[in-house]
């Protein structure tokens, strides 16, 4: 009885993981595009130092 329950739990866990992986694969191009755009913007604004100084400048003013 207990072995059957654990098997059901494992299979439902596996399908849940499969669903999550499917969602990640679906939205992967979006994440990559956002990451690339953010990287380009960061590079154009003078790297992370420029980004952080820009943020602190906005809050400082």
UniProtKB/Swiss-Prot annotation:
The chain crosses the membrane at residues 21-41. This is Uncharacterized protein ORF61. Keywords: Host membrane, Membrane, Transmembrane, Transmembrane helix. It comes from Acidianus filamentous virus 2 (isolate Italy/Pozzuoli) (AFV-2). Residues 1-20 are extracellular. It is found in: Host membrane. Residues 42-61 are cytoplasmic. One of its GO terms (cellular component) is host cell membrane. It is a single-pass membrane protein.
